[in-house]
């Protein structure tokens, strides 16, 4: 019974580290998404000023952003051995307390 409890605790720790790693990855992807949206917005602004080939260029940008192949080339960092900072550990403790 004691060994089973230890196994469950190890599994819980692993899952918490995985959760933290996925949370970090999600935050990185959100930042990347905002950067891409900003690039698109700035290019649209530049295109409005030049006013030639506007529809074709903006369409190409949207196709590139929505291109499934380019999205699938993004590598996800899912290693459970990633370093968990003290802040993340504190956040995990706070979340588990609620």
Curated annotation (Swiss-Prot):
Region annotated Disordered, chain positions: 73-98
Effect listed in the UniProt record for changing residue 18 to A: Minimal effect on SNAPC4 binding in the absence of SNAPC1. Reduced SNAPC4 binding in the presence of SNAPC1
Cited InterPro entries: SNAPC5
Phosphothreonine modification, residue list: 85
Segments crossing the lipid bilayer: none
UniProt GO molecular function: RNA polymerase II general transcription initiation factor activity; RNA polymerase III general transcription initiation factor activity
Domain of life: Eukaryota
Keywords: Nucleus, Phosphoprotein, Transcription, Transcription regulation
Name of the protein in its database record: snRNA-activating protein complex subunit 5
Record field: compositional bias (Acidic residues): 86-98
GO biological process, one term: snRNA transcription by RNA polymerase II
GO cellular component terms, A-Z: nuclear body; nucleolus; nucleoplasm; nucleus
Compositionally biased intervals (Polar residues): 73-82
Function: Part of the SNAPc complex required for the transcription of both RNA polymerase II and III small-nuclear RNA genes. Binds to the proximal sequence element (PSE), a non-TATA-box basal promoter element common to these 2 types of genes. Recruits TBP and BRF2 to the U6 snRNA TATA box.
Self-association and partners: Part of the SNAPc complex composed of 5 subunits: SNAPC1, SNAPC2, SNAPC3, SNAPC4 and SNAPC5. SNAPC5 interacts with SNAPC4.
Gene: SNAPC5
UniProt-annotated location(s): Nucleus
